[in-house]
Amino acid sequence: MTEKKNRREKKNPREAKVTFEGLVTEALPNGMFRVRLENDTIILGYISGKIRSSSIRILMGDRVKIEVSRYDSSKGRIIYRLPHKDSKRMEDSKDIEDLKDSEDSKD
């Protein structure tokens, strides 16, 4: 008998995702955050289940790794909170203040 060919090849779902580093600029309800990526785009990020179950706190000004789908680049899943260095964190907090000022001036 002839064997059936597997028409649907199994692909790794991680191949459809791209990982970026970003800075949390705003905390929203239900574990959602606005994250500014390295290329200065701002996307909506949500906490992954592993971070949620580990009770890891993510605050404004934290640097995070975020996994973004190739199909919808406006949303991403926060998969890791990067350890912060005091000097870098201070620079980032100044960046956040500048970003807020520029957003306020637009309104």
Curated annotation (Swiss-Prot):
Region (Disordered): 87-107
Keyword Flavoprotein attributed: no
SMART domains named in the record: S1
Record field: transmembrane: none
GO molecular function, one term: ribosome binding
Annotated Gene3D superfamilies: Nucleic acid-binding proteins
Subcellular localization(s) per the UniProt record: Plastid, Chloroplast
Assigned GO CC terms: chloroplast; cytosol
Transmembrane found in the keyword field: no
Key words, A-Z: Chloroplast, Initiation factor, Plastid, Protein biosynthesis, RNA-binding, rRNA-binding
Matching CDD domains: S1_IF1 (cd04451)
Family listed: Belongs to the IF-1 family.
Assembly mode: Component of the 30S ribosomal translation pre-initiation complex which assembles on the 30S ribosome in the order IF-2 and IF-3, IF-1 and N-formylmethionyl-tRNA(fMet); mRNA recruitment can occur at any time during PIC assembly.
Full protein name: Translation initiation factor IF-1, chloroplastic
Lineage: Eukaryota, Viridiplantae, Streptophyta, Embryophyta, Tracheophyta
